[in-house]
């Protein structure tokens, strides 16, 4: 399920805040010192996954995580050092092909078929849903765009020639196209409720439980940022995070 490069890289970055939280706020970490090194090793492997897949979505997700770190922590020496270590580590291990792939992000929106294809599908989705606004077209409804996407191109964009249907490649357009505005409302409600649950947990309990709650929110935000370019709305990760956040919200203050 998560074997596609962009999806795998995004999920790998989603795991990093959870590993970091478990490193400092886990009962196992308190009783087994090697566990902390294990979480650091898994975090490093997650970075290697971003490099190894050469997926630009992974870099976007990683940038989102760095942004969350900057927002959450005061810029002291430890935080500054940790953030600086990420690009240095990538620079040390990444092949030239990775840098070439990442350098194409800037002009991808006008010259690369993969990126243009996504944008064209999103335009088509808005048109498609205008005829079935409440419930959308159902699962795999993207197949309805087979052979007609060229009608939604604009200006000097690279030409899209595709006989079969092209997937949504965006969790929000995916939900909109397949379940309509009704489904999108429910989906956004789940995301918002997850964030609010964890904010309440952080405010009410703080401490180790609060750290876990913050990590759950960060993982969800990273997943959504990566999900702007991949169709993973119905993969289980979002719903795992929602379920754990609900469970965490029931913890009583000791």
Tell where the protein language model's regions lie, with residue ranges.
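Hydrophobic transmembrane alpha-helices and their immediate junctions
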Residues: 66, 71, 178-222, 244-245, ...
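Alpha-helical transmembrane segments of integral membrane proteins
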Residues: 33-43, 56-63, 78-83, 101, ...
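Membrane-interfacial segments
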Residues: 24-28, 57, 76, 102-106, ...
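Long extracytoplasmic/lumenal interhelical loops at the membrane interface
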Residues: 108-123, 131, 135-179, 200-204, ...
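Alpha-helical transmembrane segments of multi-pass inner-membrane proteins
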Residues: 1-72, 82-87, 91, 193-200, ...
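Loop-to-transmembrane alpha-helix initiation sites
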Residues: 6, 231-241
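A membrane-periplasm/extracellular boundary helix in multi-pass inner-membrane enzymes
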Residues: 44, 48-53, 70-113, 123-131, ...
């Amino acid at each position: 399920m998560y074997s596609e490069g962009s999806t795998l890289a995004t999920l790998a970055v989603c795991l990093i805040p959870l590993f970091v939280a478990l490193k400092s706020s886990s009962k196992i970490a308190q009783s087994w010192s090697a566990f902390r090194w294990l979480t650091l090793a898994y975090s490093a492997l997650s970075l290697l996954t971003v490099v190894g897949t050469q997926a630009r979505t992974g870099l976007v997700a990683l940038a989102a995580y760095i942004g969350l770190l900057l927002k959450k922590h005061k810029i002291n020496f430890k935080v500054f050092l940790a953030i600086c270590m990420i690009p240095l580590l990538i620079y040390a291990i990444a092949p030239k092909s990775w840098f070439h792939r990442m350098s194409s992000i800037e002009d991808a929106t006008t010259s690369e078929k993969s990126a243009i294809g996504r944008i064209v599908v999103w335009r088509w989705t808005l048109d498609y849903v205008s005829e079935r606004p409440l419930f959308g077209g159902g699962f795999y409804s993207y197949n309805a765009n087979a052979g007609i996407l060229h009608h939604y191109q604009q200006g000097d964009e690279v030409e899209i020639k595709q006989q079969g249907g092209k997937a949504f490649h965006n969790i929000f357009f995916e939900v909109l196209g397949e379940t309509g505005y009704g489904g999108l409302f429910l989906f956004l409600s789940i995301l918002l409720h997850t964030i609010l649950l964890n904010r309440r947990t952080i405010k009410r309990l703080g401490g180790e439980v609060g750290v876990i709650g913050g990590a759950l929110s960060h993982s969800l935000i990273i997943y959504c940022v990566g999900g702007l370019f991949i169709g993973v709305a119905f993969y289980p990760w979002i719903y795992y995070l929602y379920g754990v956040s609900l469970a965490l919200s029931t913890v009583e203050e000791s």
